[in-house]
Every structure is written in C-alpha cells, then in structure tokens.
From Swiss-Prot:
GO terms for biological process: defense response to bacterium. It comes from the Eukaryota. Disulfide bonds: none annotated. GO terms for cellular component: extracellular region. This is Caerin-1.17. It comes from Ranoidea gracilenta (Dainty green tree frog). Keywords: Amidation, Amphibian defense peptide, Antibiotic, Antimicrobial, Secreted.
Length: 25
C-alpha cells in the first residue's frame, strides 16, 4: 500500500538526511 511505499522511501532517505540534521543540531 501507500504506507509501505512511504516506509521504503523513508528508509532510503534517512541515511542521507540524518547527517544533514546532525550538522544543524
């Protein structure tokens, strides 16, 4: 379903977004 797609996308984006968030914090 839609949520499973969003979940898989989030798992792919998290490794890239986490370092950016860490730098802002």
């Amino acid at each position: 379903g839609l949520f499973s797609v969003l979940g898989s996308v989030a798992k792919h984006l998290l490794p890239h977004v986490a370092p950016i968030i860490a730098e802002k914090l």
